[in-house]
């Protein structure tokens, strides 16, 4: 069996004729999961690849910060996107999930790795900043300003290569 991840922001796909009057919401016809659903879906825009990119960006930010986009700390216009954007690049360690940093520090604390600790720590920090910047670029408000799929793949591949080279 092969697992596939797709259309994360489109958990529900509702057409107007599928919504009965007993089950109406104020966001009639809104498709997706709150927090991952791009803003344009709230005003009736069609489902698009750009919407999937938005959802992917939010998911990426969630994975690396450990914060859900629906966290109580996010109110009104302050959201996960803005939380991370405000911190970069100088305060990346203040928004990164500490569990990620602790896992890496445990690996680097072994005797064979101590001589390269500073270099590896710098590479790790650069990679984390790059990944969060990708998440920010994917989750911008306006669809035309979001990264394209090919650019996301290229940049993530570049980060992966840099991270793996830094481990040697």
Predicted regions and their residues:
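Cytosolic eukaryotic protein kinase-like domains
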Residues: 1, 5-168
């Amino acid at each position: 069996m092969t697992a596939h991840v797709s259309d994360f922001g489109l958990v529900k796909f509702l057409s107007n004729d599928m919504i009965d009057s007993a089950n109406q919401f104020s966001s009639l016809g809104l498709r997706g999961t709150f927090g991952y659903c791009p803003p344009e879906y709230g005003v009736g825009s069609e489902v698009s690849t750009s919407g999937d990119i938005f959802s992917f960006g939010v998911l990426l930010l969630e994975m690396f910060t450990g914060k859900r986009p629906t966290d109580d700390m996010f109110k009104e216009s302050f959201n996960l996107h803005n939380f991370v954007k405000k911190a970069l690049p100088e305060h990346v360690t203040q928004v990164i999930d500490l569990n990620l940093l602790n896992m890496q520090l445990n690996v680097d604390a072994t005797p064979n790795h101590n001589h390269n600790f500073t270099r590896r720590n710098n590479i790790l920090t650069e990679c984390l900043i790059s990944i969060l910047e990708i998440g920010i670029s994917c989750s911008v408000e306006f669809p035309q300003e979001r990264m394209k799929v090919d650019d996301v793949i290229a940049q993530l591949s570049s980060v992966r290569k840099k991270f793996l080279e830094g481990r040697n």
